[in-house]
Amino acid sequence: MENGAVQQLQLLGKRVKGFGVGGRYVAHPYYSGRFRELLGCTPFPGTLNFDANLDWRELASMCEPQVIPGTVWDGVRLGAVYVWKAKIMTRHGYVDCAVIRPLLSGHPPTVLEIVACEKLEPILENNPDKTVIVTIACKRGDALRWRRY
């Protein structure tokens, strides 16, 4: 692989319920500006959570993330977030998104979150098993790897 070449990592996971707080963080000025730069839009104030059956640390070792560093904002600690530019399969084709892992997350290490320009739930395939297909753009790693739930 050429130095700096973009490779793809495809994850196949299952949607899971979140804690209901993702929207508050995505809409926070500290994070929303970073997501706006990455996605080219104001992100929908919420996340779609999925169990990738892959520990986020393993993902980070295969595909180097961008990092939004932690900070203190008006006396409140905001944790660092790992971010991967990606696309999610919807009934309309692939949609640009960001796969994220907040480092202060209370989710199991295999649960990742997706941030996008629009609410994803209505445009995902109506499949009873709640499958999610995400393709992450990597700057290093193998050409294509599959992780199945």
From Swiss-Prot:
Entry binding sites for FMN: S105, E113
Domain of life from the UniProt record: Archaea
The species this protein was found in: Hyperthermus butylicus (strain DSM 5456 / JCM 9403 / PLM1-5)
Cofactor descriptive note: Binds 1 Mg(2+) ion per subunit.
Keywords: Flavoprotein, FMN, Kinase, Magnesium, Metal-binding, Nucleotide-binding, Transferase
One GO MF term: magnesium ion binding
EC number(s) stated in the UniProt entry for this protein: 2.7.1.161
Catalytic activity: riboflavin + CTP = CDP + FMN + H(+)
Cofactor annotation: Mg(2+)
Matching InterPro entries: RibK_CTP-dep, Riboflavin_kinase_archaeal, Riboflavin_kinase_CTP-dep, Riboflavin_kinase_dom_sf
EC main group: transferase
HAMAP family for this protein: Riboflavin_kinase (MF_01285)
Residue numbers binding CDP: G18, F19, G20, V21, G22, G23, E118, K119, L120, E121
Task performed by this protein: Catalyzes the CTP-dependent phosphorylation of riboflavin (vitamin B2) to form flavin mononucleotide (FMN).
GO BP terms: FMN biosynthetic process; riboflavin biosynthetic process
Pathway(s) this gene product operates in, as recorded in its UniProt entry: Cofactor biosynthesis; FMN biosynthesis; FMN from riboflavin (CTP route): step 1/1
UniProt cross-references to Gene3D superfamilies, sorted A to Z: Riboflavin kinase-like
Pfam families: CTP-dep_RFKase
Key word Magnesium present: yes
Protein name listed in UniProt: Riboflavin kinase
UniProt keyword annotation of Magnesium present: yes
Protein family membership: Belongs to the archaeal riboflavin kinase family.
Binding locations of Mg(2+): T47, N49
